[in-house]
């Protein structure tokens, strides 16, 4: 379950207006079939108290929040892929409100691979997100809802970080952010990221493979030349 909304309930919003009225100390109310009664222990009320019950409070905008969040990616440990896992360190800045309970996700350009619940306070917050997934071209970013950090970091290869990686099996880690499955556009983005990752991080391997392909074609043409007279020699 992922909570993304406001932490101030309608009751707290109503209580926030109590400074606009005069308050009195009374006992616990006694509710009868037709009356709501209580006693004034201080005897400061000379007349009576009028209680007005209405539905004029607007509860339509309770899901909206004035909180503003800015995200930046600090560091990453671990490896991409589904075996080792990674730990993404995010710096989250909260403004416009004093506290905010929400979720921060670790995503690349295609999809998200982990999420954690964060109780943010005003100012800078350091959040650690443990996730699994991605590929060599994944640049993991810190995201909140649809907003992500401007830069992403690339994790190490699984065979290089097998020992120091985050091979987590704890129940308090969230590896699913509740997003729908990866669709057609998502797979195109993943394929593009993977190709760019291969070209950027392993360009020497690609160059060697291309050179071996050209050398194999040349050796094949030299060692196994085409025989145009084969049909004439075996003509019945």
UniProtKB/Swiss-Prot annotation:
Belongs to the hantavirus envelope glycoprotein family. Residues 1-202 are lumenal. Glycans are attached at residue 25. It comes from the Viruses. This is Envelope glycoprotein. Residues 219-231, 219-236 are annotated as: Binding to the ribonucleoprotein. One of its GO terms (cellular component) is host cell endoplasmic reticulum membrane. InterPro entries: Gc_C_bunya (IPR048791), Hanta_Gc_N (IPR002532). Pfam families: Hanta_Gc_C, Hanta_Gc_N. Keywords: Disulfide bond, Fusion of virus membrane with host endosomal membrane, Fusion of virus membrane with host membrane, Glycoprotein, Host endoplasmic reticulum, Host Golgi apparatus, Host membrane, Host-virus interaction, Membrane, Phosphoprotein, Repeat, Transmembrane, Transmembrane helix, Viral attachment to host cell, Viral penetration into host cytoplasm, Virion, Virus entry into host cell. GO terms for biological process: fusion of virus membrane with host endosome membrane; symbiont entry into host cell; virion attachment to host cell. Disulfide bonds join 67-97, 90-142, 107-112, 143-148, 182-186. The lineage of its organism: Viruses, Riboviria, Orthornavirae, Negarnaviricota, Polyploviricotina. Residues 224-236 are cytoplasmic. The keyword Flavoprotein does not apply. The chain crosses the membrane at residues 203-223.
């Amino acid at each position: 379950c992922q909570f993304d909304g406001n932490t101030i309930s309608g009751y707290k919003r109503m209580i926030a207006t109590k400074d606009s009225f005069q308050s009195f100390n009374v006992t616990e109310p006694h509710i009868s079939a037709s009356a709501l009664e209580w006693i004034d222990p201080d005897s400061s009320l000379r007349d009576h108290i009028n209680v007005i019950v209405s539905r004029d409070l607007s509860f339509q905008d309770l899901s909206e929040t004035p909180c503003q969040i800015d995200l930046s990616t600090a560091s990453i440990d671990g490896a991409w892929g589904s075996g080792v896992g990674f730990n993404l360190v995010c710096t989250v800045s909260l403004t416009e409100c004093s506290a905010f309970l929400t979720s921060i996700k670790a995503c690349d350009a295609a999809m998200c691979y982990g999420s954690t619940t964060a109780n943010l306070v005003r100012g800078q917050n350091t959040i650690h997100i443990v996730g699994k997934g991605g590929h060599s071209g994944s640049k993991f970013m810190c995201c909140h809802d649809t907003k992500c950090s401007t830069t992403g970091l690339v994790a190490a290869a699984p065979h290089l970080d097998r020992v120091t990686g985050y091979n987590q099996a704890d129940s308090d880690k969230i590896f699913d952010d509740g997003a729908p499955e990866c669709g057609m556009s998502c797979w195109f983005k993943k394929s593009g990221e993977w190709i760019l990752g291969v070209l950027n991080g392993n360009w020497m391997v690609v160059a060697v493979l291309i050179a071996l392909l050209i050398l194999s074609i040349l050796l094949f043409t030299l060692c196994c030349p085409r025989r145009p007279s084969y049909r004439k020699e075996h003509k019945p």
